[in-house]
């Protein structure tokens, strides 16, 4: 074997190990030639395909260029058309303006020519529109009141500018309603002075709320904070506060004036005797009982008698003279007669001497009374008769001496409760009792005060009595957060500042009735719990045995229970 073959065999590897190198050499040469011929054919075909695609792309480019040219031509044509239209419209507007100027000149000439030419003038098509509005306004005297409020010299004739302004304002109010402006327009004043009685009868059944806004169907108030409403037909409490009374006012004057709204009693508070209600609506206007010589001898005055602390009988001059000197003959230790007691007690602040008897107390006039009406409807009628000022509702009290301007403060039943959110449940263990709440304060005002001070307020209630549903001077505040509740009851006292109210109120845990003992009560056995431990270590209700059992430890000796009424 030649040297060249041996070298080739060594290159071929193990396939020529058995001496087959010559056959493999022939096969490899033929395969190489075939591969080269295939490559040449493939290259020729690729060149032809590239030429074809190039031609196609060239045609596509030409088509795109043609389309772009067409679009540009169309845009130019549209621009030309638009410019022509705009020019034509401007020319038409100029022509119309010239025509209007010419017609105005003709109208002025026709007015100057005389009454004969006035009859030949064409009728304005808008004149019927203005005439309809004039006829509509003629039946509404409040429109004249509105015009005269703007211009005092205005007449009954409604001019076109006013009608145009009214129409534009009406359309704007329909598109963008304004509740306050609608309320003002609804409450337009009646210009007829003599028609006051008719106006009062028409509004007799209206419901006036404490913030002087029109109530909604729930008898509540328009505010995003108010979620409460009245349950039942009543709106106001039958107990009404009347303030601003002078010292010379008499109870007979009060009864005589306010009895026009319904049967009532007068609750006259004083510093020494508390509240006395001695005028009964069932027998009012009947013959009065003869008053005794002194109110000290009357332990329980009969119903129907005017309050003995007030009398409409003026004291005799002799009585006044005796009361000034202290005795009949100028001696010492004068005995107080009926005239002297009436002067000291009825008018309040008398300067007569004190009695040497069994320590008679002199009544001091507080300047306010409470009216206890028999029906809630009477309070509504009273409120409709009042007039509004910045401080509240007022009415003119007609007395025997002179008319008196007094304040009327009704209590709206919806103001006794306030809910922050219906979705938050109320935990009875996180309810605080608020003592010393001013009576004019509403639940929503108390809620906002505690919300700003402690936060997490859920519900607020004002305690009211069962008979008249009038505030008792206390309230309840429910919290949703334990730490806020603990902070409130640990402070114990807080000063409440609201408008003209500046008073210190007491905060302590609220005790609920009919609570079961949380220490020994189970599902089938409920033990009444009269004690509640507000300490953070306990903080639960206990029955008496469990209280002694749980507080027998030295660490709980100092815990003080909360009991109802203490």
Swiss-Prot record:
One of its GO terms (cellular component) is nucleus. Keywords: RNA-binding. It comes from the Eukaryota. Cytoplasmic polyadenylation element binding protein that binds to and regulates the translation of specific mRNAs. It comes from Caenorhabditis briggsae. CDD domains: Bbox1 (cd19757), RRM2_CPEB2_like (cd12726). This is Cytoplasmic polyadenylation element-binding protein 2. PANTHER family: CYTOPLASMIC POLYADENYLATION ELEMENT BINDING PROTEIN CPEB, TRANSLATIONAL REGULATOR ORB2. Residues 17-46, 64-98 are annotated as: Disordered. Residues 87-98 have a biased composition (Acidic residues). InterPro entries: CEBP_ZZ, CEBP_ZZ_sf, CPEB, Nucleotide-bd_a/b_plait_sf, RBD_domain_sf, RRM_dom.
């Amino acid at each position: 074997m030649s040297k060249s073959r041996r070298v080739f065999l060594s290159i071929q590897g193990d396939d020529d190990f058995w001496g087959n190198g010559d056959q493999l050499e022939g096969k490899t040469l033929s395969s190489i030639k075939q591969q080269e011929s295939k490559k040449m054919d493939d290259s020729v075909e690729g060149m032809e395909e590239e030429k074809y695609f190039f031609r196609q792309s060239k045609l596509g480019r030409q088509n795109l260029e043609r389309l772009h040219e067409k679009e540009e031509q169309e845009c130019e044509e549209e621009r030309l058309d638009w410019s022509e239209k705009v020019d034509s419209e401007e020319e038409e507007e100029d022509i119309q303006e010239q025509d209007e100027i010419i017609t105005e000149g003709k109208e002025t000439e026709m007015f100057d020519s005389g009454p004969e030419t006035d009859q030949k003038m064409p009728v304005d098509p808008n004149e019927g529109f203005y005439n309809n509005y004039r006829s509509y306004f003629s039946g509404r005297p409040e429109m004249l009141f509105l015009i005269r409020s703007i211009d005092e010299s205005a007449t009954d004739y409604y001019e076109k500018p006013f009608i145009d302004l009214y129409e534009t304002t009406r359309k704007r109010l329909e598109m963008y309603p304004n509740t306050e402006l609608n309320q003002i327009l609804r409450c337009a004043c009646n210009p007829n002075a003599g028609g006051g009685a008719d106006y009062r009868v028409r509004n007799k059944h209206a419901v006036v709320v404490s913030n002087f806004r029109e109530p909604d169907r729930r008898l509540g108030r328009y505010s995003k904070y108010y979620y409460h409403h009245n349950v039942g037909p009543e709106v106001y409490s039958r107990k009404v506060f009347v303030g601003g009374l002078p010292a010379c006012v008499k109870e007979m004057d009060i009864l005589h004036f306010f009895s026009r709204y319904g049967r009532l009693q007068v609750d006259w508070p004083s510093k020494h005797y508390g509240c006395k209600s001695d005028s009964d609506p069932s027998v009012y206007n009947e013959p009065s009982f003869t008053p005794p010589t002194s109110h000290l001898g009357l332990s329980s005055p009969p119903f129907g008698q005017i309050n003995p602390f007030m009398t409409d009988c003026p004291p005799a001059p002799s009585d006044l003279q005796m009361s000034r000197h202290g005795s009949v003959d100028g001696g010492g230790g004068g005995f107080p007669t009926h005239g002297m007691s009436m002067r000291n007690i009825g008018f309040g602040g008398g300067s007569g001497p004190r009695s040497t008897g069994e320590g008679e107390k002199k009544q001091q006039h507080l300047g306010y009374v409470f009216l206890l009406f028999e029906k809630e409807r009477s309070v509504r009628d009273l409120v409709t008769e009042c007039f509004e000022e910045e401080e509240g509702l007022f009415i003119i009290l007609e007395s025997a001496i002179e008319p008196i301007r007094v304040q009327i403060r009704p209590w709206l039943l919806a103001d006794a409760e306030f809910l922050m959110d219906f979705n938050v449940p109320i935990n009875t263990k996180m309810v605080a009792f608020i003592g010393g709440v001013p009576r004019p304060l509403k639940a929503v005002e108390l809620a906002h005060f505690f919300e700003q001070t402690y936060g997490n307020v859920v519900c607020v209630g004002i305690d009211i009595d069962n008979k008249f549903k009038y505030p008792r001077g206390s309230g309840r505040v429910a919290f949703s957060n334990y730490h806020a509740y603990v902070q409130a009851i640990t402070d114990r006292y807080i000063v409440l500042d609201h408008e003209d109210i500046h008073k210190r109120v007491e905060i302590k845990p609220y005790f609920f009735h009919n609570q079961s003992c949380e220490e020994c009560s189970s599902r089938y056995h409920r033990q009444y719990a009269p004690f509640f431990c507000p300490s953070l270590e306990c903080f639960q209700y206990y029955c008496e045995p469990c209280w002694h059992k749980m507080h027998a430890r030295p660490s709980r000796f100092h815990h003080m229970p909360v009991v109802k009424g203490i």
